[in-house]
Amino acid sequence: MLINIEGIQAFCQTIRNPRRIIPHATFPTFSQIPCNINYFLEQKFQVPVDIRALVLDKDNCITLPNETTIAEAELKKIREFQNIYGEKNVILLSNSIGTRKLDPTGELAAHFQQKWNIPVVRHSKLKPLCTEELYTYLSNNSHVSSASQILFIGDRLLTDITLANIMGSWGVWLTRGVGNTTNMMMEVESWLYKRIHTQNPYIPTNRKS
């Protein structure tokens, strides 16, 4: 069993600053995110939005938890986003594959990347504290020049959305996901979100990370 020390640290910090888990948009599933997500966010917040890279979670976002097969509807949406943003700008950042803790040889990440043609970021720190590793990867491998040009998509408020807000990026929260699965931490996240969701989210600004 993986103990996410980084996630525990993030939870403690979130208690002091709960706005960090507030997403900029919510959708039930990944396949329901509009392809014109830039326009969607611009209309919602009335600010310019220039998203150049999408950072996807894996478990319950595009696959069932602990599996590697991408659901049909989710794969179709991935290909649509790849056509819009370019293949190298739609990447996977997961705490189950690509991490030094669970995938030390990188074999799982390499297999997933080759099978689905989706770049998988290797990182030593778990989400949400892998900001430097992620931004270094994006700076070297994508068109991103500012954290405000990144959109995070995932089903976890304390990892995916918190990471987005720490970096000064955009975050989309999937409220149901592929398998509509839940666990104790997800229930805690939902409980906390219901009590603070009326607060305004942090709005990304066009700055260097």
Curated annotation (Swiss-Prot):
Membrane topology annotation: Peripheral membrane protein
Pathway: Phospholipid metabolism; phosphatidylglycerol biosynthesis; phosphatidylglycerol from CDP-diacylglycerol: step 2/2
Record localization: Mitochondrion inner membrane
Keyword field contains Hydrolase: yes
One term under GO cellular component: mitochondrial inner membrane
Keywords from the named record: Hydrolase, Lipid biosynthesis, Lipid metabolism, Membrane, Mitochondrion, Mitochondrion inner membrane, Phospholipid biosynthesis, Phospholipid metabolism
Key word Membrane present: yes
GO BP: cardiolipin biosynthetic process; mitochondrial membrane organization
Pfam families (UniProt xref): PGP_phosphatase
Motif Phosphoryl acceptor: where in chain: 57-61
Function: Phosphatidylglycerophosphatase involved in the biosynthesis of cardiolipin (CL), a unique dimeric phosphoglycerolipid predominantly present in mitochondrial membranes and which has important functions for cellular energy metabolism, mitochondrial dynamics and the initiation of apoptotic pathways.
Name recorded for this polypeptide: Probable phosphatidylglycerophosphatase, mitochondrial
Protein species of origin: Schizosaccharomyces pombe (strain 972 / ATCC 24843) (Fission yeast)
